[in-house]
UniProtKB/Swiss-Prot annotation:
Protein's job: Component of the FACT complex, a general chromatin factor that acts to reorganize nucleosomes. The FACT complex is involved in multiple processes that require DNA as a template such as mRNA elongation, DNA replication and DNA repair. During transcription elongation the FACT complex acts as a histone chaperone that both destabilizes and restores nucleosomal structure.
Gene (UniProt): spt16
Disulfide bonds: none
GO cellular component: euchromatin; FACT complex; nucleus
CDD domains cross-referenced by the UniProt entry: CDC68-like (cd01091)
The protein's name: FACT complex subunit spt16
Source organism per UniProt: Schizosaccharomyces pombe (strain 972 / ATCC 24843)
Length: 1019
């Protein structure tokens, strides 16, 4: 538990509230029973009984439940007896000066004799306070710790007068501060999301499609939703920064239908089948140990009487909210509501509930705030109530079947008391039009005052289709979503075409989109004096300093720069050695003529020299020196091109007058000097610095001006939590060029033993197993909070230049961007893979289009290709995406306004982009990217205009690296006329229309630029 943080300010503030109430003469006498001390014992964690006064006190004061802990409250001191590890967390509470009471921490070890002395010390403290001890008698505790305490306390228990102090604590817990209200509000948001976004959709599906499911199974299905993190991270839920690790159910959801209803909070879901008449559902979540509750009634084909009763219930609840305000007496509220029923609907009085709810907070049901006619308590601003209003055992005069004879109506909401109208935290839809479902084609059953339902829109819960006649609502939604996506893609394609024509309009850009290589001048020596002294020997010299080869030609030394040398070869023939030097010149067979510019290609060039010598060892050494120098020159040129975009950042402006914001014990990728050691990150004025522990000058500086993206990825489903920086321009880290720098910490399975500071691994199966598992979850949550908070500080320090981005795991899909199958996760601005190296960061607003390849029936995977707006950038391929995720990928691309096309085959994008770059204006004038969406031959399109200008190959992707000679021979064979396969097709008896179609396709292919020669002709 070493990762927990105890808020000492909150602790002492709330402890002061408790002591003030306790010392108050009236409260001390009536609520605390004049007790002189309060004894609170908590044993092992009990999931079956989470709502107890003792654990509520722990949560309220400390922020957490501390199992195996004893607290003794006195009016001048609080004593806490707990394990060593927990005690270390609480030590700072005792160091606070000017607190309302002293804090005394006692550390319990595994020494039984020492623990016995500590228990006896607690008893001595109690004896010194007049022996009247306040306890919480309804709490049930168990475990080894409780057994040890009872063995000491039970023999002397008769000495003390034990009184019930529950009401005193309840008053202190009743009024919530801002932090507590925020927790209840967060829990309520989740409850509303599950009710309106999950339960309603599932309920409508079951009823609409006539599927059978029991109440208990439906309830279990909802309860398991808490493990579905993707659902809670859906943007449409608008849950904000809810920490899912702090979320839990208050109780198993209660679902009732089919004539059997129980409106009590203690109701249990039965095993009867779900029935489409009147369905009641109530559920509640706890967030950071604070509860919420919401309940709704859903009506299926209701008659006019049911609608009338429900409308009255909604109006009654509205009045109930009006009565609940600061200063109102709880008993009077119930009496007023009952008076309204007697005045307007006396027939419903026997069916009205006996109480209208209770207080809610750390405890799900604060019984001291029970809303009934007998409670004299006065409501105060800051209190929170769980209001439950309803009518039970109602008789349906026109039942459709035996299960519809009786029904009930129920509304439950969580509210905050204010000085005016209360704040309703659970604003799930409850109007008549939102909860009524009609299967009939006409609306004759509607009462006059209720308007017919509008056609359902996306996200509504209404079932308006006729059962057995039309398709289900889900199918309709899918079809409408597909139509909307297709229409949106057409708009995006038109926009891309217009942007391309405008971007490459005549005169706005050079006619060629390819940057032409420039002529490089090499000068070996500026003057004769720089030549080596050995030139007088008229031998072949290799001058490393000048990067030149000096050749004796007609008795004169002639230098040739190494860059002019193409290759060298050595042959032994008899007693002589032949050294041949081939030089670069235009027009060479197999040469890359376009990449080798010359000042005057029509000038005369020396292509080769051949030297003969009888000195074998000398020529061998010369040949080796030439080879080595050529390799070194080639390596330098490669490195120059590779590091051409590497920049040298400005200097980091450090914060000198104080310790900058920092985070410790983080690793960096790429590692400095190849050594994996934890360091720390500091935030300075114009950037951040990662400092290695090796030496002071071993660090990485990242300036805000060079940061392009900042990501935080939580450790959910991962082994690390990380902060990732994607740079605008690469930098050098050690000897490596990098554009991505990542800081991370591993989520290990190591914890500290509570009896010391030695690390030990989990020992699953011992008595602390549940506590340790909970410890691991909380450790992960703590890591997420720590890293996210630091990432937010980085974004804040950048003064708006960068924004923090977090991956959406619910939108993730698997794919292979490099060699490994990884999980790619969209963010607001990017598509990323940050867990494994090499990293993937694709900026969405730099994408021109996307192309889905190998999309055809029978294949299990498809590929995704991104083409960038900068056509000189090579496209990025993400291969082997499961076909099950095709619709999700399409929906994501469409939601990001990315125009995409799909096709059945892989395209040769190297050839395509080369053609596009050669003349981008002509490309867009001839239709641009529209060729990707043109129908293929097997779809039966006979129009010449629709023929794709690029022909896809069904060959293996590895075939894209074929020799040029093979491509030329294939071109020639196709230009000569029909291929052999076509001749065979003709002989097999094709009709004239088929032959004419092929001829038109062949002409169109040769008139336009093509992808690459295909070994087979596709039909």
């Amino acid at each position: 538990m070493a990762e927990y943080e105890i808020d000492e300010i909150t602790f002492h503030k709330r402890l002061g509230i408790l002591l003030t109430s306790w010392k108050n003469e009236e409260d001390g006498k009536t609520l605390f029973q004049d007790c002189d001390s309060i004894l609170v014992t908590v044993g092992a964690h009990d999931d079956t009984n989470p709502y107890q006064k003792s654990t509520a006190l722990h949560t309220w004061l400390l922020g957490y439940e501390f199992p195996s802990t004893l607290i003794l409250l006195e009016k001048h001191r609080i004593t806490i007896l707990t394990s060593v590890n927990k005690a270390n967390m609480l030590t700072k509470l005792a160091e606070t000066k000017g607190a309302a009471a002293d804090v005394n921490i006692l550390k319990r070890t595994k020494d039984a004799e020492e623990n016995k002395k500590l228990f006896e010390k607690i008893i001595e403290y109690i004896r010194a306070t007049n022996k009247k001890v306040g306890v919480f008698p309804k709490d049930k505790t168990q475990g080894k710790f409780i057994n040890e305490w009872d063995s000491i306390f039970e023999p002397v228990k008769s000495e003390f007068n034990l009184v019930d102090a529950s009401l005193g604590l309840a008053k202190c817990l009743a009024i919530k501060d801002e932090q507590e209200l925020a927790n209840i509000k967060g829990a309520s948001r989740v409850s509303v999301a599950v009710m309106s976004k999950y339960f309603v959709d599932e309920l409508s599906t079951y009823i609409d499609q006539g599927k059978k499911i029991t109440h208990s199974k439906f309830s279990d299905q909802m309860e398991s939703l808490i493990d579905n993190e993707a659902f809670f991270q859906t943007k449409s839920l608008k849950l904000g920064d809810i920490d899912l690790d702090q979320l839990e159910w208050c109780y198993t959801p209660i679902i009732q239908s089919g004539g059997s209803y129980d409106l009590k909070p203690s109701a249990i879901t039965d095993d009867r089948n779900l029935h489409g008449d009147v369905v009641l559902c109530s559920l509640g979540f706890r967030y950071k140990s604070y509860c919420s509750n919401v309940g709704r009634t859903y009506l299926f084909d209701p008659d006019s009487e049911q609608q009338k009763n429900y409308s009255f219930l909604v109006a009654l609840q509205k009045k109930l909210f009006e009565y609940c305000r600061d200063g109102a007496v709880i008993g009077d509220i119930y009496t007023k509501i009952l008076g309204l029923i007697r005045a307007k609907r006396p027939d419903l009085e026997p069916n009205f509930v006996r109480n209208l709810g209770a207080g809610i907070g750390i405890e799900f049901r604060e019984s001291s705030l029970l809303v009934n006619a007998k409670n004299p308590r006065v409501l105060q601003a800051g209190m929170t109530l769980n209001l439950s209003i309803g009518f039970g055992n109602l008789i349906n005069p026109h039942p459709k079947n035996s299960q519809s004879k009786e029904y009930a109506l129920l509304l439950i909401d969580t509210i905050q008391i204010t000085r005016s109208d209360p704040i309703v935290f659970t604003d799930s839809p409850k109007a008549q039009g939102d909860i009524s479902y009609f299967f009939g084609e006409d609306d004759s059953s509607l009462e006059d005052g209720v308007k017919p339902r509008k056609p359902p829109t996306r996200g509504t819960a209404t079932i308006s289709s006729h059962k057995g006649k039309t398709r289900s609502e889900t199918r309709d939604l899918d079809d409408s979503a597909e139509k909307r996506r297709v229409e949106h893609q057409k708009q995006l394609a038109s926009r891309k075409q217009a942007e391309g024509l405008q971007r490459f309009a005549q005169g706005s850009v050079p006619s060629s989109g390819i940057e032409k290589p420039t002529v490089k001048r090499f000068e070996s020596y500026k003057r004769d004096s720089q030549l080596p002294q050995a030139i007088g020997e008229l031998r072949i010299l290799v001058d490393y300093r000048a990067q030149s080869i000096i050749l004796p030609i007609f008795g004169r030394p002639v230098p040739f720069h190494i860059s002019t040398l193409k290759n060298a070869s050595k042959n032994d023939e008899g007693n002589f050695v032949y050294l041949r030097l081939n030089f670069v010149s235009p027009g060479q067979i197999g040469g890359k003529k376009d990449e080798l510019p010359f000042e005057d290609p029509n000038a005369q060039f020396i292509r080769s020299f051949t030297f003969r010598s009888s000195n074998n060892s000398r020529m061998s050494q010369v040949f080796k020196d030439i080879q080595d120098m050529k390799k070194a020159a080639t390596k330098r040129e490669t490195e120059r091109k590779e590091f051409a975009d590497v920049i040298e950042q400005d200097k980091l402006i450090e914060i000198k007058n104080k310790r900058p914001a920092h985070i410790n014990d983080v690793y960096v990728r790429p590692a400095i000097d190849g050594k994996r050691l934890p360091g720390f990150i500091e935030i300075h004025q114009n950037g951040i610095r990662y400092q290695s522990p090796l030496r002071s000058d071993s660090h990485i500086d990242l300036l805000f001006s060079n940061m392009k993206h900042l990501f935080f990825q939580p450790c959910e489903g991962e082994l690390i939590v990380l902060i990732h920086v994607h740079l605008k321009a690469p930098i050098m880290v050690g000897k490596r060029k990098t554009q991505d720098v990542q800081f991370y910490r591993e989520v290990s399975d190591i914890q500290f033993d509570e009896t010391g500071n030695k690390k030990r691994k989990y020992m699953y199966g011992d008595e602390d197993e549940l506590e340790q598992e909970q410890e691991e979850r909380r450790r992960r949550a703590q890591l997420d909070r720590e890293f996210k908070s630091f990432a937010e500080k980085i974004a804040e320090a950048s003064e708006g230049r960068i924004e923090l981005d977090i991956p959406f795991r619910e939108l993730a899909f698997n794919g292979v961007p490099f060699r490994s199958n990884v999980l790619l996760q969209p963010t607001t601005d990017c598509l990323v893979q940050l867990t494994d190296t090499p990293f993937t960061v694709i900026t969405l607003n730099e994408i021109e289009i996307a192309h889905l390849e190998r999309v055809q029936f029978g294949l299990k995977n498809f590929d995704l290709v991104f083409i960038f707006q900068d056509f000189r950038r090579p496209p990025i391929h993400i291969n082997t995406i499961p076909m099950e995720q095709l619709d999700n990928v399409k929906e994501w691309l469409d939601s990001c306004d990315i125009c995409f096309y799909e096709g059945p085959l892989n395209l040769n994008w190297t050839t395509i982009m080369k053609t596009v770059n050669e003349d981008p204006i002509a490309f867009f004038e001839e239709g641009g990217w529209g060729f990707l969406g043109a129908p293929s031959d097997d779809e039966g399109d006979d129009s010449v205009e629709e023929v794709s200008e690029y022909e896809a190959s069904d060959a293996d992707p590895s075939d894209e690296e074929e020799e040029e000679s093979e491509e030329y021979s294939e071109d020639a064979s196709e230009e000569d006329g029909y291929s052999e396969s076509e001749v065979e097709d003709e002989e097999s008896g094709e009709d004239w229309d088929e032959l004419e179609r092929k001829a038109r396709q062949e002409d169109a292919k040769h008139d336009a630029f093509e992808e690459r020669p295909s070994k087979k002709r596709h039909r």
